Amino acid sequence: MFCIQCEQTIQTPTTKGCSFAQGMCGKTAEVSDLQDILVYALQGVSFWAEQGRKVNVILDEIDQWAPKAFFATLTNVNFDPERVIEFALQAQDYKQQLEETVRAAATVTNTELDELSPAAKFELPTEADQIIALAPQAAVNRGHETQHEDVIGLRLLCLYGLKGAAAYMEHAHVLGQTDKDVFTEYHQIMAWLGTDPTDLGELLDCSMKIGLMNYRIMEMLDTGETNTFGHPEPSQVNVKTIKGKCILVSGHDLHDLEKILQQTEGKGINVYTNGEMLPAHSYPELKKYPHLVGNYGSAWQNQQKEFANFPGAIVMTSNCLLNPNVGQYADRLFTRSIVGWPGVAHIEGDDFTAVIDCALAQEGFKHNEIEQMITVGFGRNALMAAAPAVVEQVKEGNISHFFLVGGCDGDKSERSYYTDFTAQAPEDSVILTLACGKYRFNKNQFGDINGIPRLLDVGQCNDAYSAIQLALALAKEFDCGINELPLTLVLSWFEQKAIVILLTLFALGVKGIYTGPTAPAFLTDNLLAIIQEKFDMRSIGNVEDDLKAILAA
């Protein structure tokens, strides 16, 4: 195996990347290799999907399936080798279907097709042991023996950025949002990466294309969520537990949460959100259910202890999943969609009867805890509605600076930086936050500035779109560029969704972003220097020094 896609990957003076029997995330070498094979097979699918555009052959089923399958290879999503093989064999079938259809259409129209890429030539056998033997051909760092390390690093930046974008494409698709132009660009980029490109300039340009494409995808996802569930509105959420039977919903999929709420009505079951599902409590069409009672736990890296202590059924709708056998709750865990763990029950379709039966069979919480409320729901509409008041407070000198502090959380001790940063931020500053990094500080008290809360929870990681809209509105109001605003982004990264959001911000021209806790291992020192120079990206350091530098600028 060789995997270097997440922040927790092995980094020593002599080794970068997980290359032993098991990755730091818990996936086995077998699963890692199978995921590489799946990705390479998907690049072959995209080759033929791109060729199909030349002869007006577009198969919607394949367009919608391909990003979903790619999502299955994202960090902490699918650890089940059988499921990954199923995806890979389906990719092979779809590639053959596309090839036959496209070649036939090209013959009729006398259209010349491109020479087959290495990924398009990649063929899978049907037996598992024969499939795994192909792993060296499909390794994400293939060619590293002869190619410059900067080439490999930029290929991976593009691959991992596109993987994050694919995840958001699937989230949007679940809510009925697709875009043919986005599918076309996705296939173009995926197919091109399957040619093993070597030009550094073209690879850098590709990363910016991915960032801009993801901006459109985040807009689609925002549309899907608000059209389906209404616009988020500031709402109080209880972060303590209530007596009764219970179901915990984790991941990102609001559609699944809605189905669970509908199917548990009148059954005496309390439903809790976990992790990135916290913003659900601010959507009118979700918070209307009285048995959506609160948010349980914290960020994903704490789930093995928190899930073990949860006396009910647990549904994992997307990333991030950890080994459930550690806390001995695998028999109460259910996976959905692209998520998988060997031996854990998987729910196909929208029937959650098995989850409900499991919840009713568990003890549930035996008493009520004393309520503790936090506020969520400062989505796009809420932020835009507050913009005039915010502008007034800035002009009157009551608000001096804005910080966007958030992103993916993780278990490294260095991540306490984000807790300390928000605690030490000036009292006349406003802090926007999103994604699970918020759990580092979202239960702390920050007060308000003349009625404007100092901590504004924007939502999930993809709701960076809402924060961008606020920044654009403020820039217009103050007649300046985004980079001239008293606004600083302080981001934490862990996996590929964070990578693509960073690429989106770069592509939109946002500079001076602070990132941490460590730099991506797949980026060489030379590439980091290029990115730092081009985008003024900065690594987090000492909180006091960073704040001093930010406020002095």
From Swiss-Prot:
EC numbers: 1.7.99.1
InterPro entries (UniProt xref): HCP/CODH, Hydroxylam_reduct, Prismane-like_a/b-sand, Prismane-like_sf, Prismane_a-bundle
Amino acids binding [2Fe-2S] cluster: 3, 6, 18, 25
Residue positions where Cysteine persulfide is found in the record: 408
CC annotations in GO: cytoplasm
Enzyme category, top tier: oxidoreductase
GO BP: response to hydrogen peroxide
Protein name according to UniProt: Hydroxylamine reductase
Taxonomic placement: Bacteria, Pseudomonadati, Pseudomonadota, Gammaproteobacteria, Vibrionales
